Amino acid sequence: MTVNVAVLGAGSWGTILANLLVENGHHVELWGNDPEKVAEINEQHTNKHYLPEFKIDSRLHATLDLNEAFEAVDVVLFVIPTQVIRLVAEQIAPVLEAKGVKPVIVTASKGLEQGSHKRISEVLTETIPADIRNGIVVLSGPSHAEDVAMKDITTLTAASTDLVQAQWIQEIFMNDYFRLYTNTDVIGVEMGAALKNVIALGAGALHGLGYGDNTKAALMTRGLAEISRLGVAMGANPLTFIGLSGVGDLIVTGTSVHSRNWRTGNALGEGQKLDDVLENMGMVVEGVATCKAAYELAQQRSVDMPITNAIYNVLYRGCDIRTEIGNLMQRSGKPEIDFK
């Protein structure tokens, strides 16, 4: 079965997922908005800014033209920064309607929209009418593009309220090194995917400050607890957070030098300024915007998220990291398991 896929976003993850789908035998159009990058992918079969050592399959075609990308399309895969998803979705909706296609919409982006605090699937539901899409599937889990490029074994979750569509996406992506599981808890999968980026900033900061494994383990474990609290308050199944999109994604993002969020936190821990770190990164660090959304959402829902609050204070109020750590340690005693 050959499927026509349009991948939106020619960054590291978008390029790798597009390449994987081509290798799985599907026809893929990779849409980007940078003419030089699109030309590089088509002519040199590289994307050196994001994947310096990776050779792209010559069958993968990149394009600047949404009309070309959506020709007879079966799947539209969003792999773009969270804060521009609404804008791009609003642009593609009339193109899909004009083409007369009704694809499955898949998102592999991870974050919460600033201002509205909405999950990505909620944004897509609002911007792409139901009569021009065939369901929405969330793709999430512990996955760095660099590892998938090396064909390291990787497992993700395909989540949808429509299990049949999740199973179809599962079939399209799976091969001998890339395995998907299905889940119907879209809220839990998306909340875990978004919020782990915030905790990864903290984990990186601890490393930059010179803290050891005990401290990092404490932060990640208690970070998962508050991710779960907010997720459950939003309607998620608490068991989702011990799965791939919860603890799995938190482990890989909170411990790896491949993680932009971890690297950003590490640089902050070493004493660098946030604006300088983000400028030098040259790529979107989702956890920074998501931290603000998570902080505001927790305030609205009266959910206790002390680690997220501390990271927010560092990012948005200029507070000292060590002072925030001290404040966390001076809190009154609490039960370990508490979803309130």
From Swiss-Prot:
Q: What is its EC number?
A: 1.1.1.94
Q: Which domain of life is it from?
A: Bacteria
Q: Give the record's GO biological process terms.
A: carbohydrate metabolic process; glycerol-3-phosphate biosynthetic process; glycerol-3-phosphate catabolic process; glycerophospholipid metabolic process; phospholipid biosynthetic process
The active-site annotation reads 196 (proton acceptor)
Which PROSITE patterns does this UniProt record tie to the protein? NAD_G3PDH
Pathway assigned to this chain's UniProt record = Membrane lipid metabolism; glycerophospholipid metabolism
Question: Where does this protein hold NADPH?
Answer: 12-13, 110, 145, 260, 284, 286
Residues noted as binding sn-glycerol 3-phosphate in the record, renumbered to the chain = 110, 141, 143, 196, 249, 259-261
GO MF annotations, alphabetized: glycerol-3-phosphate dehydrogenase [NAD(P)+] activity; NAD binding
Q: What PANTHER family does UniProt report for this protein, alphabetically?
A: GLYCEROL-3-PHOSPHATE DEHYDROGENASE, GLYCEROL-3-PHOSPHATE DEHYDROGENASE [NAD(+)] 2, CHLOROPLASTIC
Identify this protein by name: Glycerol-3-phosphate dehydrogenase [NAD(P)+]
Query: Which species expresses this protein natively?
Result: Latilactobacillus sakei subsp. sakei (strain 23K)
Lineage, uppermost ranks? Bacteria, Bacillati, Bacillota, Bacilli, Lactobacillales
